[in-house]
């Protein structure tokens, strides 16, 4: 099953909102200027993806699930995940299964992730980080991977202990989502992680701009992986007995 991951550096003062319904524009009015731009940019990118991939001209109705996770109201529409890092907006979409996306700006973290976040890492994860040539970068990439899985599972607030990663073997175990796969890479100062349940057959990566629309940058799969030294792939271990 194919997943789509699109990024947009939203440098425009105001995004073009012609594909957004009136209720979305109304909801944005109560937000601060920074929050409003992020909110609208994320939904503009989602709306443009829905038009580009499925021919849907206006963003469908979105609800908030009890977990706090946004979702299309219609269960017949794709699952999606939104992420923001600096001026970059990201959307991940899949017509099958569930998705989770996270983006992090590397230069925004001048030190290792804080002590509270480090406490959520297993000894295996901390040992792997310490052995890397750039522990700051490696710690942030692992954190990004964790966040994508937690967003997939709807557990961004209190689900840290439900997930363990083994970076050396590329395996993960989630108590909430027993079948999942994650792909992650570092692109310049940005690290990204795309999680999908049950598995990523193909990940189609796109860049978006209002002027040129969508441009496919790469297609990733089990057989077709980038030469990037930072690319990581995690696959679920069987549930612990």
Regions found by a protein language model. Give the residues of each.
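Conserved nucleotide-ligand handling architecture
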Residues: 1-241
């Amino acid at each position: 099953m194919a997943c789509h991951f699109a990024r947009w550096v939203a440098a425009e003062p105001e995004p073009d909102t012609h594909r957004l319904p009136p209720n979305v524009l109304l909801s944005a009015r109560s937000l601060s200027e920074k929050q409003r731009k992020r909110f609208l940019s994320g939904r503009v990118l989602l709306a443009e993806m829905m038009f580009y991939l499925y021919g849907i001209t206006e963003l469908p109705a979105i609800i908030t699930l009890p977990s706090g996770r946004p979702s299309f109201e219609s269960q017949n529409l794709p699952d999606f995940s939104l992420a923001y890092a600096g001026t970059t907006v990201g959307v991940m979409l899949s017509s099958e299964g569930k998705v989770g996306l996270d983006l992090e700006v590397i230069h925004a973290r001048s030190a290792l992730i804080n002590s509270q976040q480090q406490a959520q890492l297993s000894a295996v994860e901390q040992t792997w980080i310490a052995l890397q040539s750039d522990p700051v970068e490696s710690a942030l990439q692992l954190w990004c991977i964790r966040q994508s899985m937690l967003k997939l599972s709807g557990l961004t607030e209190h689900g840290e202990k439900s997930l363990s990663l083994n970076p050396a073997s590329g395996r993960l175990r989630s108590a909430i989502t027993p079948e999942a796969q994650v792909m992650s890479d570092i692109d310049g100062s940005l690290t990204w992680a795309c999680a999908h349940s049950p598995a990523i057959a193909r990940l189609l990566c796109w860049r978006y701009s209002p002027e040129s629309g969508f441009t496919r940058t790469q297609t990733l799969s089990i057989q077709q992986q980038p030469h990037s030294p930072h690319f990581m792939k995690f696959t679920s271990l069987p549930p612990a007995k």
